[in-house]
Amino acid sequence: MAKKKAFIPFFYFTSIVFLPWLISLCCNKSLKTWITNWWNTRQCETFLNDIQEKSVLEKFIQLEDLFQLDEMIKEYPETDLQQFRLGIHKETIQFIKIHNEYRIHTILHFSTNLISFVILSGYSFWAKEKLFILNSWVQEFLYNLSDTIKAFSILLVTDLCIGFHSPHGWELMIGYIYKDFGFAHYEQILSGLVSTFPVILDTIFKYWIFRYLNRVSPSLVVIYHAIND
């Protein structure tokens, strides 16, 4: 009976780890066709709005030098000019298809992550008793560690999150989240988040040491400062 009670929280922890992956896999397969049909139908009605048209034109300009194209058009005979215009038309259609695929990818990933968040929130609320047992296990495990190991672990985590080399890790993680949600890569937003998050975490961590650790385990704070120095 005791083994069964111990197995249930472990099963709950395992399900929390793998459930987001399963939800993402199922939602991607089930929603992709529906979102594609919805987007293509909507595009037939509106074709390109101003933002989409600007995006397509910017991509086209990146590949072709318009000034050189004008000179080439003047030198081409009529038959070659028609073929050239036909090639430009096909290339523009290809740009539009790529643009639509990108928009579908964005909507699909955002919808999948939103559904995963709702399902996980409901699942956590439904099994909050098992979550409480897991929390007690973690607290008991941390309580049995020595103050030296605790201080070393805190120092390791803080150096990884807010240390000198942490911005590169934050850049990779935030970039992965952006990609997972299907958002475009914006260097200014990414730089702002990378420069802001470590500062916020550092402030929260110092406040936590001041308010919690000093009251619970003063010796741990002393060891931490000794190792940090």
UniProtKB/Swiss-Prot annotation:
Pfam families: CemA. The chain crosses the membrane at residues 6-26, 107-127, 189-209. GO terms for cellular component: chloroplast inner membrane. It catalyses: K(+)(in) + H(+)(out) = K(+)(out) + H(+)(in). It is found in: Plastid, Chloroplast inner membrane. Keywords: Antiport, Chloroplast, Hydrogen ion transport, Ion transport, Membrane, Plastid, Plastid inner membrane, Potassium, Potassium transport, Transmembrane, Transmembrane helix, Transport. It is a multi-pass membrane protein. One of its GO terms (molecular function) is antiporter activity. GO terms for biological process: potassium ion transport. Signal peptide: none annotated. Its main location: plastid. Belongs to the CemA family. HAMAP family: CemA_PxcA. Contributes to K(+)/H(+) antiport activity by supporting proton efflux to control proton extrusion and homeostasis in chloroplasts in a light-dependent manner to modulate photosynthesis. Prevents excessive induction of non-photochemical quenching (NPQ) under continuous-light conditions. Indirectly promotes efficient inorganic carbon uptake into chloroplasts. This is Potassium/proton antiporter CemA. It comes from Crucihimalaya wallichii.
